[in-house]
Structure formats: structure tokens, C-alpha cells
Amino acid sequence: MIIASTFDYRKAAKRRLPPFLFHYIDGGAYAEETLRRNCSDLQALALRQRILRQVGGVDLSIKLFEQRLDLPIVLAPVGLTGMYARRGEVQAAHAATAKGIPFTLSSVSVCPIAEVQEAVGGGFWFQLYVLKDRGFMRDALERAWASGVRTLVFTVDMPIPGARYRDAHSGMSGPYAGLRRFLQAFTHPHWAWNVGIMGRPHDLGNVSTYLEKKIALDDYVGWLGANFDPSIGWHDLQWIRDFWKGKMILKGILDPEDAREAVQFGADGIVVSNHGGRQLDGVLSTARALPAIAEAVKNDLVILADSGVRSGLDVVRMIAQGADAVMIGRAFVYALAAAGEKGVAHLLDLFANEMRVAMTLTGAQTLKEITCESLVNTDAFKQ
């Protein structure tokens, strides 16, 4: 199979993965309207092509906090990444490190913090949810800091899990889910051997380390549902801000008022995100939400954006809308599932090449030269 884009990697991942895993990463909440609009709204932004702009030697690098990145891309936290390739978090972290960008380890990863640290050293980021079990949160933060993590991505848009119809149909949840997953694995022998058998253990590494017992896939949804805390407010986060000595990014901002409150709270950055359309269906796409948020807090903190990014062209569009950099989740998981570490590295090369073409043809030699003027009709999404 010829692989030339994220879309090709998606097709390859669909062939290789059992349906319950493919649809878990591919799907969204409810009827998936926001999932679709994340992509369609972003791709609807027309790039403004210019000619004879004397663009040579396009520079894709950026400095985020104290870290120099070769690309304005961060691999987003994705739960259960280790189910998509053998020890998948380690493979993705290797690829990101080799390409000079951060990998963000999910708190509900298969590989624990220590395993990733042993593989790539420090420099990766760590993501944490708001949970009722404050002991787990404190333990995870301490382990992350001891492993060299200096950037915390704190997810704030998941006080309660979103309803995902696809999961019930695919076998991730719903009636006879365990039996359905077993039968699917049986009909996907490559995954069953390479990941299902050779990729063990398949527990939630960070949670199991803390509880000193395995939290397996069957317990994943139940454990999360029992530990999400919908009652939390800004004041409840203060202990985390005081406890964490590194940079802190709040992930899941969709409203300018929340962005302003993040500044007042003392966040170093935000991720404009609707959780990839996986939480509340019917909310704004990131492409539509980003301009107003950037206008409100652009000079106060670092702005990242995710949800709907499938190419280097989309990266340029997000930056033109006001982001400093982007996070990608589904895209890298497709590549990881299809071709492991090499697939993720290749995907990042594709993104970089697409960015170079887009920047050259829009007259931008550096990322700072990508502005709203790089788009046509940018007022269309302003609120």
C-alpha cells in the first residue's frame, strides 16, 4: 500500500487493527458532528497564495517555553496508545524525540512514566486529568518530575466522559464486549501476536503503579468513570499550580472567557481543543473557536490547538488562526498502528514537507510570518 498522507495511514490502520480499537481512536461523541466539523471547518480555510515573495530556506522551528522544537507540532496525549502498537507510547516517544518535538504521555497510558523515561530520557511532556483520587494525581506528578518531565498538560474538558455511540457497536463497550474483542483479535492475527501477546502487559501502567495492582482494559472505562470529578472548580486546581514547579498547560479551552481565567489562574499555556470531538457533540470546532481566543489572550500565554489537524496545511491554517503550535493525536496513532515508530517518523516528515510547500506558496519564510493575512476571508469564523 502506498502511503502519502494521514488519510493513507488511516486506511492502513483500519486494515490492521481490530474494529474495537480502530473505532475507539477514529470515533467521536454522539452523532460525531463536531468530529466532522473539526476537519471540514479547518480545511475550508483558504490559504492565500502569493507569488515572487523571495522565500528560500523555510524555517519550521519554534521555541516553546525553554524548549527548541524542529516543528511546531507536539504529539498529543492519547490514552491506551500501547494498544495500537507494541509498547506504543515508547515507539511514539522515540519517533518524536528523533524529530525534535515533544511526546505527551497520557496518564492513562499502557506504558508507565518510568518505562518511557528509560527509553528516551527526559524531555517528554505528561498529561493529567482532574480526578477524585488526589493521591494518584500527586503520585503521578511526583513520578513525572523525577523522570525529567517539566511540562504538564492538564486536561480540563473531561469532568465526565462523553457518550460515544461507536464504542457500543464496536466492542469497546456494550453487550458481550469482552467476547466481541476476543473474536476480533482472532481475525486480526498480526495485531493479536505483535501487540496482543508480545505487547503485554496491557494494564494502565501509571494507575497500576500507584494502586499496586493491574487495571486492565476491561476496567479502564469503569475506573475513569468512577474517578472523574465534575464538581471541581478553579480554586480546586490551585494546589496543583502550587505543587507543580514546571510549566503548566490547560487543555480543553473553547471559550475566550475560560482562556482569560486560565491567564488569571497562572497557566503558562492553553490548548484550544474540543477533545477531538470526543466529549460534547455540537460544540464549536477548534477552527471556529480559535480566532476569538487568540484575540483575547495571544500575548499572555502560549496557545496550542488540536482537533482536526490532518496535514501540514492544517498546521499552517491553525497558526494563521492564532495558534503558536499544534497537537496531533489521531494522525500519529494511525501511523503508529500501521507502521510503528517508523510510521510516526514518516508522518512527521510528511507534515514538514507539506508545511514547507504551504509556507513557500503563501510567502512565509518563518512561522512568525504566518498570520491571518496568510488566509483568505479570515473574518468568516470570527465571533
Swiss-Prot record:
Record: residues binding FMN: 106, 127, 155, 251, 306-330
Record-level GO cellular component terms: plasma membrane
GO molecular-function term, one example from the UniProt record: L-lactate dehydrogenase activity
EC number: 1.1.-.-
KW Signal (keyword) present: no
Main location class: membrane
Catalytic activity annotation: (S)-lactate + A = pyruvate + AH2
Role this protein plays: Catalyzes the conversion of L-lactate to pyruvate. Is coupled to the respiratory chain.
Sequence similarity: Belongs to the FMN-dependent alpha-hydroxy acid dehydrogenase family.
HAMAP family from the UniProt entry: L_lact_dehydr
UniProt-recorded name of the protein: L-lactate dehydrogenase
Species this protein is from: Bartonella tribocorum (strain CIP 105476 / IBS 506)
Organism taxonomic ancestry: Bacteria, Pseudomonadati, Pseudomonadota, Alphaproteobacteria, Hyphomicrobiales
Gene: lldD
